[in-house]
């Protein structure tokens, strides 16, 4: 069959259906300075492959690469060491595919991998059931809010002010078109989360309360009180975790009464990768809610001969069967990233994960102690895992830029995450992992002393 490209008439009809007057209207959300409106600058129209590679390598050399400089960026994406065996396994031909395993008779390897992944996530989160992954943490968070609305038959979600703002923005964007109310807030710059203020916002119309653990400022708090307050009003507690390594050291959300636990799985097995692809994790504490869960579910069964096998189960929830009545519009899963996560978790084991978590926390404590000695720096947190917030007494965005020029990636400024909230502009989120050396910590402390002098 010959391929027939779109005609101008086809394009006009499609634009008319979606209410756009031109192709440019489809990209109005992309800032003009980020759009390519002509040939790539500094690159000739025609060049050999070798010349293009040389040019692009020269451009790439201007980047500050995480492994080459002291690196303290976090705020939802973390640099951890990924064993070489992870990449080796996920690149095997049996796994390196975008195919969804609808036919169990030819996909037992993939299905078993997904089943093992679900088991690991459920245990990590302290839940009974986990799905076979989602796109990333922010979309998993939204799907949890949507699920809570279906379960409770309510449409108001209360978001903690200490939830990552990118997660809040995704939720608000989706809710805008689906008739749900998102009650969000801004973070309070204080040593401990304001649990009392959060619980006071719960009412009889609330479908769920969404909290982050550890939160955007790195703080850790017992969530039992919030769970009890939510349940007393008939609402669900959704807990977001952006750093799964933390759960090797702190209590799981399910143990504290969370009904739905979601998060970002990038820390285990998946590199930073310029922001993606990442890995959404999704689990529920009580399997009575399983039919309202989004995404794929892989189950264990026996075949006609009584042999153990794996299949996609409860598929009537899904888009390929229920279409517009499906529990979500997710029509595949981040299978390869899920495999990377599962391989890394398996290589670590329970003891290895706890040791990794302990090392992350140890280095964070060393970093906090060093920065507390810098004149003009205040360490905000009473509690933290591998990430904490400092106040530097001036615009932290400028501090980050200045230190980047000195070859130190100092952290993520709250001013970058909340550009319209002036009172947050002097706060800087600093993250450490097992890849952080004591020399890196000293480099950050010395650079801050020089800049703040």
From Swiss-Prot:
Q: Which CDD domains match?
A: GDC-P
Q: Which reaction does it catalyse?
A: N(6)-[(R)-lipoyl]-L-lysyl-[glycine-cleavage complex H protein] + glycine + H(+) = N(6)-[(R)-S(8)-aminomethyldihydrolipoyl]-L-lysyl-[glycine-cleavage complex H protein] + CO2
One Gene Ontology molecular-function label:
glycine dehydrogenase (decarboxylating) activity
Q: Which UniProt keywords apply?
A: Oxidoreductase
Q: Say which enzyme class the record assigns.
A: oxidoreductase
Oligomeric state and interaction partners are given as: The glycine cleavage system is composed of four proteins: P, T, L and H. In this organism, the P 'protein' is a heterodimer of two subunits.
- Write out the similarity annotation: Belongs to the GcvP family. N-terminal subunit subfamily.
Query: Protein name, please?
Result: Probable glycine dehydrogenase (decarboxylating) subunit 1
Gene name, Swiss-Prot/TrEMBL: gcvPA
